[in-house]
Amino acid sequence: MAGASRLLFLWLGCFCVSLAQGERPKPPFPELRKAVPGDRTAGGGPDSELQPQDKVSEHMLRLYDRYSTVQAARTPGSLEGGSQPWRPRLLREGNTVRSFRAAAAETLERKGLYIFNLTSLTKSENILSATLYFCIGELGNISLSCPVSGGCSHHAQRKHIQIDLSAWTLKFSRNQSQLLGHLSVDMAKSHRDIMSWLSKDITQLLRKAKENEEFLIGFNITSKGRQLPKRRLPFPEPYILVYANDAAISEPESVVSSLQGHRNFPTGTVPKWDSHIRAALSIERRKKRSTGVLLPLQNNELPGAEYQYKKDEVWEERKPYKTLQAQAPEKSKNKKKQRKGPHRKSQTLQFDEQTLKKARRKQWIEPRNCARRYLKVDFADIGWSEWIISPKSFDAYYCSGACQFPMPKSLKPSNHATIQSIVRAVGVVPGIPEPCCVPEKMSSLSILFFDENKNVVLKVYPNMTVESCACR
């Protein structure tokens, strides 16, 4: 007991000496220190394996996962009782989040100027908010001159640290730069022991730049009379997140115009992602279709025998479906009857009896009335998997079936559909078709993808998944 007290007294003495010398006492068992996101020295966890340049990708992935989790947690009853589709309020009442990576401009007159290319912002996207994220390293390595001769505590010094941000608009055609505004950030507000990430709202600056059609923005990060820590390790580059509301996202073919417009997307040059995202990219798993042939998806025509695909490039390499092969027919006594038919090759596949029974059973089980049917869309099948990060596929569903008279209440027919079905059943007016089975309620889908400048974008597209069907 006396020995333990002596050891405790000795440890307290060393602790006081270290405080007198202005040193921070090192915690015992440093290997048990909790890992902090962005800390490359702490072990464990996928965050410790991320490269500094992947910080923006990690941020966008967390935002996508958060939205997708809330979207998946919706209940079927959440759509009832209202005409507006269910939509979580996570994107600040917007439907678009764009990320922009910075590029250090060492060749310009102002060294340390980080340039952002904002040309991906469209005219239809109204900026709701914008934030600049930047890293300044460890606060403990910042050299400060204390005004008091007696010495200052570490926390007292930290209160005087302030970062200045100078925003510039750049015009490389004229080799000119114009001051856009000044901002300041207090480092103590966002302190982290390992890597200090700071953020600053730049909404007004970007709105002003977009209004003047100035999409090349530069930020110069400095400190007031104090020296920022030297970069012992490469710091993550600054990045900008822009929350916007795209007014044209509900327009016809908005998904095709924004996602299919990446036909010249440079494959193999996407930014690095960690292991659980690389599988979502799968850039090399699909061969490009022939550019000289219009597919049925592009010309809006039904596929037929006149559409000739390159067998070696598409179907043999991809093989999304199991090949159906005709089995050898059993010997029968009706060979003479079979020979009497025309001697041309039949274009109908010959199935065995077991396959036909399964097809009939499946047809009997499926309702003939208007109902929601299952449809899974894989982005690899339509050639979009190279730039869409997540999801790889989604359940779209579709509506199909008859709306015959009398229509049950479960089909939720409109008054016009009810009258139309009666007129068709009576037959007074010839040529009247029956009402159509169409989607009644639909939900949105969030898609994470690369834009033409290889920036990560999150968009929430409305009316992507059928929730219920009705006769109209």
From Swiss-Prot:
InterPro entries the record matches: BMP3/BMP3B, Cystine-knot_cytokine, TGF-b_C, TGF-beta-rel, TGFb_CS
Localization: Secreted
GO cellular component: extracellular exosome; extracellular space
Protein family: Belongs to the TGF-beta family.
GO biological process: cartilage development; cell-cell signaling; negative regulation of ossification; osteoblast differentiation; positive regulation of transcription by RNA polymerase II; skeletal system development
Basic and acidic residues bias (residue ranges): 27-37
Primary role: Growth factor of the TGF-beta superfamily that plays an essential role in developmental process by inducing and patterning early skeletal formation and by negatively regulating bone density. Antagonizes the ability of certain osteogenic BMPs to induce osteoprogenitor differentiation and ossification. Initiates signaling cascades by associating with type II receptor ACVR2B to activate SMAD2-dependent and SMAD-independent signaling cascades including TAK1 and JNK pathways.
Region ranges (Disordered): 27-53, 320-350
Organism taxonomic ancestry: Eukaryota, Metazoa, Chordata, Craniata, Vertebrata
MF terms in GO: BMP receptor binding; cytokine activity; growth factor activity; signaling receptor binding
Subunit structure, as described in the record: Homodimer; disulfide-linked. Interacts with type II receptor ACVR2B.
Classification via Pfam families: TGF_beta (PF00019)
Stated name of the protein: Bone morphogenetic protein 3
